[in-house]
Structures are given as structure tokens and as C-alpha cells.
Regions:
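Buried, small/hydrophobic-residue-enriched core segments of structured protein domains
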Residues: 1-255
């Protein structure tokens, strides 16, 4: 917003870059790619505005500020809201009495990159969001074969008539993957959700084949898990794309 922009515009010694658009335009990896792509041997440090404030308070006042503002949201939260709490706080009190049902999935972070936690679990160190969605372990008659429009489908296979709802339709998605891992099917859709000058399909296949040369040539140094999270979400082959990316990065680091 304007207030935030004014804060950053008044800081000396920085380069102010603005980005807009749908996810993943807010990912730092995508932004770095368009400002100054990472090459082999480069070291890039990133820090959030919240982290800057923590560091500033530590050095200016000698105080480590462990407080954080946490958003509790998701389709199964009755009243989504913000809570002021501390790093490592249990989520139990954040959701007590504020759920639409008990059979839910708690996620530390967002639905694309977050981690499953229990109701008596804790938010991750870097997470400022607790997401609550339906668990999604209930069997459904005919599954994805059943024509319907109440299911989101990027490929118009599951939820065949979902396009009739228009682009602004909101869906209450659950944790069901609607299938198991299968052969890698190339559909050309990964490139549609990756706003970077790379070929994610071929990069992922190079990682799976442990082909170091092609991994480097296809842009492994420019991505981390969150940058290809949408690829995992729309993958008809049901592969754990983010885990594959992490394996590739560790292969290069340890290789």
C-alpha cells in the first residue's frame, strides 16, 4: 500500500523494485530472477521486512524481539483474524473455539509450501500464517470421473465443468491429492505457472535423472521449492515437485 511504499522510498542506499501480479510474483526467487539472475557460484542473502526490524532492534536497543503477528485463515476457520504472539507459540489457543469442524488439516504456512502440524503443534520459525482446511480423506463416489463444477481443475479433468463458474469462483479445497504418483506426464502446463525464463518440466526431469550438467543449464541455481509449488499443485502425475527440487539442490551442494 501507499504507506509501506513511502517507508521504503525514504531509505537510503537501497534499490527499490516493485512487482505485481498473481502468485508466485511475490516469491523472492522469482523477483531475483528478473532483477539479477543467480549464476553458479553466486551467494544471495534475503531478509524479510520483519527480519530487518528484528535486526535493527537488536543492534539499536540490545533487545531480541521474539513477537510476531500471525494470520489464522482457511476455509475451516469461522473468523479469520490476526493474533499477536511469539515465535514458537502453540497453535492450540489460536484456533480453540474458532473452527467450523474438528476434522481438519493444520498447516504451518500456506497451502502450497507449508507443513502439516497437529493441533497441539507449533508454527514454524519463518511462518506468519496458520492455514486450516478440510482433511480430505473421505471417499467420493466416482472420484474425478464424476462431471461437476464445484471442483477446481487446471486441466478441466477433475471438475470437468468448473470453467462455468468463471475465474473469480472461490473453492474450499481439501488435502486430497485425488490420485497417487504415476508416470511423469508432460503436459506443457508447468511453464504456464512459472513466470521465469526456465523450462521447469525439463529441469525436474534432469533432477530425477541426476543429470548435473543439464540441471545447471536448465536453471537449478535460480529456484527453490516455493518457486515451483504451483507446478506440484497442478501436476497430473502427482509428484512431490518441491521435494525433487530440494533433492536437486542438495545433490549439487554435496556432489
Amino acid at each position: 500500500n501507499g504507506e509501506v511504499s513511502a517507508i521504503f522510498s525514504n531509505i537510503d542506499g537501497i534499490q527499490d523494485n516493485k512487482f505485481s501480479g498473481p502468485h508466485p510474483s511475490g516469491n523472492v526467487g522469482v523477483q531475483i530472477h528478473h532483477i539479477d539472475p543467480i549464476a553458479k557460484g553466486d551467494i544471495v542473502w534475503t531478509v524479510s521486512p520483519y527480519g530487518v526490524a528484528q535486526i535493527g532492534k537488536l543492534f539499536s536497543k540490545g533487545i531480541y524481539d521474539a513477537s510476531k503477528l500471525v494470520a489464522v485463515a482457511g476455509s475451516e476457520v469461522q473468523e479469520p483474524q490476526y493474533y499477536k504472539t511469539f515465535i514458537g507459540a502453540s497453535i492450540n489457543k489460536l484456533v480453540d473455539g474458532n473452527l467450523k469442524q474438528d476434522h481438519v488439516r493444520f498447516i504451518s504456512g500456506n497451502v502450497l509450501t507449508g507443513e502439516k502440524i497437529d493441533k497441539d503443534g507449533y508454527l514454524g520459525f519463518y511462518d506468519n500464517l496458520l492455514t486450516v482446511i478440510p482433511e480430505g480423506d473421505q471417499p467420493e463416489f466416482l472420484g474425478w470421473i464424476k462431471p461437476q463444477k464445484e471442483r477446481l481443475s487446471f486441466h478441466r479433468a477433475w471438475g470437468l465443468f468448473s470453467f462455468l463458474n468463471g475465474k473469480n469462483k472461490e473453492y474450499a479445497l481439501d488435502s486430497n491429492t485425488n490420485g497417487e504418483a504415476r508416470a511423469f506426464v508432460q503436459t506443457g502446463t508447468f511453464e504456464q505457472v512459472t513466470p521465469m525464463d526456465i523450462y521447469p518440466t525439463y529441469l525436474i526431469k534432469a533432477i530425477m535423472a541426476e543429470d548435473y550438467d543439464n540441471m545447471e543449464a536448465l536453471g537449478i541455481f535460480e529456484v527453490i521449492e516455493e518457486d515451483l509449488a504451483l507446478c506440484e499443485f497442478i501436476d497430473v502425475s502427482k509428484h512431490d515437485i518441491q521435494h525433487i527440487v530440494r533433492d536437486g539442490l542438495e545433490l549439487l551442494q554435496n556432489g
